[in-house]
């Protein structure tokens, strides 16, 4: 297999893999419903998932 073929396969694989595998993602702590600022925007990231916690939400943030 030529180096260009390998590079092509790697690029295609990176395009098809979920962002949680390729990008940087992490969960916040439990952000209480009473807080004025919640979510991932305050970190310059996107909300990709939310899970309920005691009195609030845990956000999964990805860049």
From Swiss-Prot:
Tissues where the protein occurs: Hemolymph (at protein level). Also weakly expressed by the venom gland (at protein level).
Gene Ontology terms, MF aspect: toxin activity
Cysteine pairings via disulfide bonds: 15-62, 25-53, 30-61
Record keywords, A-Z: Disulfide bond, Neurotoxin, Secreted, Signal, Toxin
Domain of life: Eukaryota
Signal peptide stretch: 1-23
Entry coiled-coil feature ranges: none
Subcellular location: Secreted
Main location: secreted
Gene Ontology CC terms: extracellular region
Annotated function: Toxin with insecticidal activity. High doses of recombinant toxin causes impaired motor behavior of D.melanogaster, which progress slowly to paralysis and death after several hours.
Domain notes: Adopts a unique fold previously unknown among defensins produced by arthropods. This fold is similar to human alpha-defensin with the same disulfide connectivity.
Other remarks in the entry: Negative results: Does not show antibacterial or antifungal effects.
Full protein name: Venom peptide U-reduvitoxin-Pp19
